[in-house]
Regions:
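Metallocofactor- and cofactor-centric catalytic cores in central/energy metabolism, strongly enriched
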Residues: 2-134, 138-143, 148-150, 154-155
């Protein structure tokens, strides 16, 4: 059987992380981008408390529901990441990954930066809360794993 997976070089993939929670150090993204060679920079913004915060944001404004600090970090660091060839992977989209993707594309346009933006969705189960016996939660989300992220990186 022939593999359709492209051959990978023997060079290790260099991955850095700039966030462990929503509200982590704002400067961490720039520090990671300037601190050494990277292929990917990740950011984890989500936890149960964060989902509550994002849910309350979304109640006030349906266009929200994502980690706003990530957007500010990208305003500061998107050009640097592009210049260095670093691909950014984050779950900062929270309850509204499409909304964050739109905001990122608008930001890139405003900055005059040609950037590819992809997002993964499908984890929002709030519309199925009754069916799943969850009552009336503010948020209900599933962990999707890495397949969507891989597809986004491959696109």
């Amino acid at each position: 059987m022939t593999s359709t997976t492209p051959a990978r070089s023997d060079r290790p993939v260099r991955i850095g992380n700039a966030s462990g929670f929503y509200g982590d150090r704002f400067s961490a993204m720039r520090e990671m981008l300037e601190g050494g060679e990277l292929d990917y920079l990740t950011g984890d913004y989500l936890a149960e408390l964060t989902m509550l915060i994002l849910g309350r944001d979304r109640l006030k404004d349906p266009a929200l529901g994502y980690a706003k600090t990530f957007l500010r970090q990208m305003e500061d660091c998107l050009g640097l990441a592009i210049d260095k060839g670093v691909r950014i992977v984050s779950n900062a989209g929270g309850l509204n990954p499409h909304g964050l993707a739109v905001a990122l594309r608008e930001l890139a346009d405003k900055l005059g930066i040609d950037a590819s933006v992809a997002f993964v969705d499908g984890d929002d189960l709030v519309d199925r809360a009754d069916e799943l016996g969850l009552g009336t939660p503010l948020t209900a989300n599933a962990y999707l794993g890495a397949f969507g992220i891989k597809s986004a990186l491959d696109s």
